[in-house]
């Protein structure tokens, strides 16, 4: 019996990594971990090989933009067919990699501003998509079948031994970096500052033994204030839906732990807590524990004593001083700055919260939703992760247990998954459609599955300006379709609703109109908002919130 092999090498990846590092050391004349700023191009040339799996940190907010500019300037004759793995595809140079033939395949979670270009490159055959993931799913695959050869990340500061301070914008960095650091991949970090004395780092978020090289970028890394919503853009329709949600969902189920999406609907909810929420008498019963980026619109609720804790996926530009001054609420280090962590916060949002509230671009008659349209391949970010019912959950809460429709000793509770949408998008484009655009997009792109963001069987409530459809109480697929149609307004789906069925659903309280909740739509206006402008949010914060220039009107 052959017990082992005397000829097979078991350290191929390690030897390959050492060869790359040695090649870089000789080519650049390095004696340590610091790459001179003006030699980053040479470093990339020696560290990245054709066909490599390359993780490029694109996050929701933080971007390794200096490294992406260096990568896009390589010779495509020498470096090509890269398999890019990016949580967030956010910068033009991310797509330039594919146009120039440097990269070929993409696995990602969210695209945002590059969604139109991804769709075009896909159609032109210049880009292949592996899959559109939720964040945790993508991180997880880095440890299974997408193990990276090279990881390019961003941090605020480093010392000469490679210790990194990632601070408020830690975001995805630990999850991305560890996959390479412990399986013989190369790790390069761009930083805003390199200090000589390790004691000059505010704290160490990533140990230097995980990092192969650091380079001072030509300018501070780009960060997008993605989760800042100007209260001036909140419309009466948003306020009406927020009032219905608070009275018809949050209050009766006593939802204490939750995640909000980034739309104006949820911003309205946050700004109604100190006003309409106080009127309802639900302070201390709802909205106490959050998995949330540090939304400026949550400031009035925090200052009013509604919020006990907030764990954050990432930072938010301008919120740094406010967060540092509220350590009882936010997770902060001994230096005072916040420690975000998207991987941990996504897990918390999956298993530890009772409710997810978000929006979508399209919803079909069964409640399936997607943000992928015929012209935009936006991806989903964390919505599929937080917007589904995790069957592995075992700890009970009132809200979770109340989603059990009928008593059963072995029944499982359910997370509340709420879709808050207007019946029409800007355009006007109907939100409710017979078939999601995701279906033909998948067929055209050769994807084996339509990129559905949230499946209808996970959705417990749909909220529109027409009312609340309590899908968790549907006793059949036909009844679920009837409930969706009952709140679809004057879309084709809504116009096909049977008035007799709608009347029955209202009688059974499976459908709640504003009047059923004793809410007068005429009173749903901006006077109810605790803050009506960015300037009001600054005032609520006691001057600690420092909004980015584009949000200032003074």
For every predicted segment, state its role.
Residues 2-554:
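Conserved alpha/beta enzyme-core scaffold
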């Amino acid at each position: 019996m052959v017990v082992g092999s005397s000829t097979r090498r078991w350290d191929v990846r390690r030897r390959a990594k050492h060869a790359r590092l040695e090649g870089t050391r000789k080519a650049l004349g390095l004696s340590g971990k610091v790459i001179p700023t003006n030699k980053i191009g040479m470093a990339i040339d020696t560290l990245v090989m054709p066909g490599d799996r390359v993780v490029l940190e694109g996050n929701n907010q933080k971007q390794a933009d200096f490294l992406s500019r260096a990568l896009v300037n390589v010779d495509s004759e020498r470096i090509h067919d890269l398999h890019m793995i990016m949580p967030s595809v956010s910068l033009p140079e991310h797509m330039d990699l594919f146009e120039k033939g440097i990269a070929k395949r993409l696995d990602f979670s969210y695209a945002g501003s590059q969604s139109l270009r991804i769709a075009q490159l896909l159609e032109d055959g210049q880009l292949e998509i592996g899959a559109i993931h939720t964040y945790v799913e993508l991180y997880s695959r880095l440890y299974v079948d997408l193990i990276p050869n090279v990881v390019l990340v961003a941090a605020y500061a480093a010392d000469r031994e490679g210790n990194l301070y990632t601070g408020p914008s830690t975001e995805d960095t630990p999850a991305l970096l560890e996959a390479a650091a412990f399986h013989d991949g190369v790790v390069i970090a761009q930083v805003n500052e390199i200090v000589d004395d390790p004691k000059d780092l505010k704290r160490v978020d990533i140990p230097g033994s995980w990092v192969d090289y650091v380079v001072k970028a030509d300018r501070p890394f780009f960060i997008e204030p993605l989760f800042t919503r100007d209260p001036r853009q909140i419309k009466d329709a948003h306020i009406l839906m927020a009032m219905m949600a608070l009275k018809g969902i949050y209050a009766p189920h006593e939802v204490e732990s939750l995640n909000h999406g980034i739309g104006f609907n949820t911003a309205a909810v946050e700004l109604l807590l100190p006003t309409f929420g106080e009127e309802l008498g639900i302070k201390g019963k709802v909205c106490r524990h959050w998995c949330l980026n540090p939304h400026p619109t949550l400031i009035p609720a925090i200052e009013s004593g509604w919020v006990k804790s907030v764990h954050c996926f990432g930072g938010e530009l301008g919120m740094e001083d406010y967060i540092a001054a509220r350590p009882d609420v936010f997770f902060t280090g001994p230096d005072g700055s916040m420690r975000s962590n998207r991987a941990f916060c996504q897990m918390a949002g999956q298993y530890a919260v009772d409710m997810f509230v978000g929006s979508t671009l399209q919803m079909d008659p069964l409640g399936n939703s997607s943000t992928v349209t015929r012209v935009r391949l936006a991806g989903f970010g964390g919505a599929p992760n937080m917007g589904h019912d995790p069957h592995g959950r075992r700890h009970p809460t009132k809200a979770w247990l109340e989603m059990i429709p009928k008593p059963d000793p072995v029944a499982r509770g359910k997370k509340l998954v709420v879709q808050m949408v207007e019946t029409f998008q800007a355009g006007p484009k109907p939100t409710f459609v017979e078939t999601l655009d995701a279906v033909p997009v998948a067929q055209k792109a050769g994807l084996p599955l339509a990129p559905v963001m949230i499946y209808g069987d996970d959705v417990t409530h749909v909220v529109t300006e027409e009312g609340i459809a309590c899908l968790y109480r549907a006793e059949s697929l036909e009844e679920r379709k009837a409930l969706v149609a009952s709140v679809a307004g004057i879309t084709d789906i809504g116009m096909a609703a049977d008035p007799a069925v709608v009347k029955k659903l209202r009688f059974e309280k499976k459908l709640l109109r504003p009047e059923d909740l004793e809410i007068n739509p005429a009173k749903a206006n901006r006077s109810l908002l605790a803050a009506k402008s960015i300037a009001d949010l600054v005032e609520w914060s006691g001057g600690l919130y420092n909004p980015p220039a584009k949000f200032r009107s003074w």
